[in-house]
């Protein structure tokens, strides 16, 4: 039986040292049994593979009519979203016969040369823009970038693709950040894998010495964490 996209992505996260199990304190103050470090994708091989995973998820979403095929540009918010947008656009072209642009924003507006807030494919009225980002915690980055996009041109944001959906409720409600963004902006938010899929996949994996990758303690803590914070 072929492994699912989520299973293969979990293997990739582990091989890249981007996924760690243990005891971590997040920015929110929550004690988490796992941590995802997007900074671990630090060479050409890893970022190319990551872009291919994003492209595969996008291709699946197009087949299921979740997002349209005629995407004009892939947008990644600075800074972490920049290599995601570039590598995803390359992978869509190379592996899925889709020629799309890439665009990202500057943290500070440039007032000379090409100028403005945006770099890459210029945004114009009517363009279909697909957002890519790593992990959503509260949706702050999306809420900051949507007004920037709309100020540039009357574009249509057709969706957002994340690497991982933490599936956690926010501090203010029992709704997850992903569901809150979908409700607020009206476009789908997809992920290559969600945290439950990651733990399900990891629970089936073994260390080189044959012992389970996830200890009984980690599995119990993961279940308790998702019971308390899961949405």
Swiss-Prot record:
5-phospho-alpha-D-ribose 1-diphosphate binds at residues 27, 79-80, 106-107, 110, 112, 133-141. It catalyses: orotidine 5'-phosphate + diphosphate = orotate + 5-phospho-alpha-D-ribose 1-diphosphate. Orotate binds at residues 137, 166. Keywords: Glycosyltransferase, Magnesium, Pyrimidine biosynthesis, Transferase. Belongs to the purine/pyrimidine phosphoribosyltransferase family. PyrE subfamily. Homodimer. This is Orotate phosphoribosyltransferase. It comes from Bifidobacterium longum (strain NCC 2705).
